[in-house]
A protein has these predicted regions:
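Peripheral, non-AAA+ core regions of ATP-driven protein-machinery
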Residues: 1-146
Length: 146
């Protein structure tokens, strides 16, 4: 249940080639009440929106009794919104190669990045299964049924 939604704006001042530049970073923060209570910890260098989808999938997997992974190594990327829609990211080819290098079985990919992911898989003859997803529910259904 969504308890609270907050918008934050951060400004960053940088100097590049003697010129001062201001960058703005807008963030939507959602506060949900969960049962059971979850406590998440992150390393200092883990940030960015491209892990939102997989974080959501990991949380879902912890909240249910079933084992969605069934012993498979599952990797993926994509942003996620409050409605569970998975959004595109940059650098998917590097993420596909990294997933293959770590011996992943399944790589979940936003639909907007799917063609690039498949091209990377074919170009380097990678063995992992690339699955196109539009929503968190797509990934859950795939894992339950495959």
């Amino acid at each position: 249940r969504l308890k609270e939604k907050e918008k934050d704006c951060y400004a960053i001042l940088k100097e590049i080639d003697g010129e001062k530049i201001v960058g703005l970073y807008l963030v939507n923060t959602y506060d949900y009440e969960l049962e059971p209570d979850l406590n998440l910890k992150f390393k200092w260098n883990e940030s960015g929106s491209s892990g939102g989808f997989m974080l959501s999938l990991a949380i879902y997997d912890r909240l249910i009794d079933d084992d969605l992974t069934k012993g498979r190594k599952i990797v993926g990327t994509g942003t996620i919104d409050a409605d569970g829609n998975v959004g595109e990211i940059g650098g998917v080819k590097y993420k596909v190669m990294g997933a293959s290098k770590s011996h992943a079985d399944i790589f979940f990919c936003p639909k907007e990045n799917y063609e690039e992911a498949i091209n990377t898989k074919n170009k380097y003859n990678l063995k992992l299964k690339i699955v196109k997803v539009e929503t968190l529910k797509d990934a859950i259904n795939y894992l339950k049924n495959n």
